[in-house]
Swiss-Prot record:
It comes from Bordetella pertussis (strain Tohama I / ATCC BAA-589 / NCTC 13251). The gene is upp. This is Uracil phosphoribosyltransferase. Binds 1 Mg(2+) ion per subunit. The magnesium is bound as Mg-PRPP. Catalyzes the conversion of uracil and 5-phospho-alpha-D-ribose 1-diphosphate (PRPP) to UMP and diphosphate. Belongs to the UPRTase family.
Length: 213
């Protein structure tokens, strides 16, 4: 299955706290990173291993070592930055590519305005992070950009997803795996996920008075 809704108790609990409208910016930001780390754990479960040896306190010890493609983490600006540290806490050696995608609030269409990608993308696994998968336009645009640059193995990590966004991504890119903490009911007339989390970017960066505590 290309879609993985991770219903681990820790994720369910933390996401439930994040849905509170009165949650502080600090708490929302910290929980975004924690859930991102838990999603990363699930999204990398099939990484290949190879035997290796190290010198331990009692001599040579046989261990396992991750092999295969290197990783690049790809936050979609700006909200994806809120998940970046969570991923890097588990894969600290990963290179970071940055994609800027904006959505026209009238047409709901996405357009890219920034591209800062690392090299050798054809040899890397890309983990795209964006808290909200709503219409899917931003995610599709980011995947388009990565594939044009040569990346062939891409996985998307989101906190909350709408069925409409999932369908849009899989229609455009059926080879992409989606890992999400929750598949919510759907979109409202303004293209926002219901019940969702509100505007994740505003809540992570504290750019609205309501969540700026």
């Amino acid at each position: 299955m290309p879609v993985h809704e991770i219903r681990h108790p820790l994720i369910r609990h933390k996401l439930g706290i994040m849905r509170r409208a009165d949650l502080s910016t600090k708490s929302f930001r910290e929980l975004s990173q924690e859930v991102a780390a838990l999603l990363t754990y699930e999204a990398t479960k099939d990484m290949p291993l190879a035997p290796a040896s190290v010198e331990g306190w009692c001599g040579t010890v046989e261990v396992d070592k991750i092999t295969g493609k290197k990783v690049t983490v790809v936050p979609i600006l700006r909200a994806g930055i809120g998940m970046l540290d969570g991923v890097l806490s588990l894969i600290p050696g990963a290179k970071v590519s940055v994609v800027g995608v904006a959505r026209n609030e009238e047409t709901l269409q996405a357009h890219t305005y920034l591209e800062r990608l690392v090299g050798e993308l054809d040899q890397r696994l890309a983990l795209i992070v964006d808290p909200m998968l709503a219409t899917g336009g931003s995610m599709v645009a980011a995947i388009d950009m990565l594939k044009r640059a040569g990346c062939r193995e891409i996985r998307a990590l989101t906190l909350v997803s709408a069925p409409e966004g999932i369908d849009a991504v899989l229609k455009a890119h059926p080879d992409v795996q989606i890992y999400t903490a929750s598949i919510d009911q759907g979109l409202n007339e303004n293209g926002y996920i219901m019940p969702g989390l509100g505007d994740a970017g505003d809540r992570i960066f504290g750019t609205t008075q309501k969540h700026a505590e």
